Amino acid sequence: MSSPSAHPAAERFPNGPFMRYMVGEGISMTGTWMQGMALGWVMTEVVARDGLQSYEGLLQAAPHLASGVVMLLLFRLGGACADRHDKRLILQACQVAQIGFALAIGQLIAHGALHTWHLIAAAALLGVSSSFEMPAAAAIVPELVAKENVAKAISVDRAVFHATRLVGPAAAGYLVGRYGAEWAFYLNAASFVALMIALATLPRRPPGTAEEEQKRQGGAGEGFRHVRQDKPSLAMVALLATNTLFVFPVIIVLLPIYARSDLKATAEQMGLLMLCSGLGSVSGSLLIMALRPALRRLAILTGMVLACGALVSLSLATGLVWAGLSLVSLAVGVSTLVGLANTIVQERSPAELRGRVSAVAGLSFFGFLPFAAIIMGWMTDLFRLRNVLLGSAVCYAVIGFLVMLTVGSRVTGEQEPDTAGN
């Protein structure tokens, strides 16, 4: 990352390039959330149409497994490419690929030709794109601002990400219910154009020192080495993995089943439930922006308590309002924890390693999610979904608090003398 003197526009916050990128990302992410909600709903319909309800949990998780396995194989390459090459071009190429996937699935839905294997194959192809997109997207934000504004920029980026959840799922619920699920995919394809335009206007990263440029050409293992040696970063990656194992499958994989089977919700009501989750996520992101570093550990512990309580509440909910309020609480807790974890990891990452460190942090999500999703889906097929939610709360509490008790006292984001050089 360049210094403020090398990047004058970054001396003020927010600057022009950062704002343009945020606008483009906001439009694109709204489309992505629309497609995500429609995808989960379409899978429930296809499973019911093909008489595969006995395997609904596993089939809901199968696309995530396909995507996650591909990303697990390619994430090191994606992180290295983000450090070595122009992140703008990497992101633009990924947008083009995702436009093609969205249009293809939309056409299959429109012609009534969609089957479960189409969704699984498309997810695997999207995994290739995401392997390169995620590290580049995470690493480009700190390059657009001065070093002292990195935490603010990451908080705004997370707030935009979560704010789109207020619009995307609700809009998708309306489109699916009124016009058909294919329109969520078509509009998602169109939304990528906004981000491509924004990326085209961003300045190139100024060259670093000779030493920094040499380090950018290093191996993918440098990211692992940094995280392993820096205890606060390691703690945050461990907490991200804990969320992936016990919380994200509930939000990403099991929510369509929960809404359709347990709450008897319509597509529009499913969209409103996701809107509740988005509202909580935005609230958590805004909290992070106003949080002093000294309060980070307390905020993480509070977020864990909120998330555990919300999972228990969801396991008992009997109506949409109850479930919606539980999702708000769950999202506040999770977004606070995940946002702080990503901020701390990015703050402590050397500029020349940021792409590879971002890939390691991303691994704690996409590396564990496919297996967690399959296990959760399988357990949902064997036991009642509500029992799975309760079990997730217990496991999340035990492992999460254990991590915080052992290494969580050093999560202020400040560099300690013994790790500053790592």
Question: Model features per residue range: what roles?
Answer:
Residues S2-M19, R205-A238, N422:
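Juxtamembrane intracellular "pre-TM" segments in multi-pass secondary transporters
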Residues P17-M37, P63-F101, H118-G177, M236, ...:
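Substrate-agnostic recognition of the 12-TM MFS/MFS-like secondary transporter fold
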Residues G26, T30-A38, V42, Q53, ...:
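A single, central transmembrane helix in multi-pass transporters
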Residues A38-M71:
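Extracellular/periplasmic helix-loop-helix junction of adjacent transmembrane segments
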Residues A38-R49, G106-H111, V167-L187, S261-D262, ...:
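Transmembrane alpha-helix termini and helix-breaking/packing motifs in multi-pass membrane transporters
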Residues G40, A102-I109, A172, V176, ...:
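Structural signal for membrane-spanning alpha-helices in multi-pass inner-membrane proteins
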Residues A61-A66, L73, L77, R84, ...:
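C-terminal transmembrane bundle of multi-pass solute transporters/carriers
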Residues A139-L144, A181, F185-Q214, M404-D418:
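Helix-loop junctions on the cytosolic side of multi-pass membrane transporters
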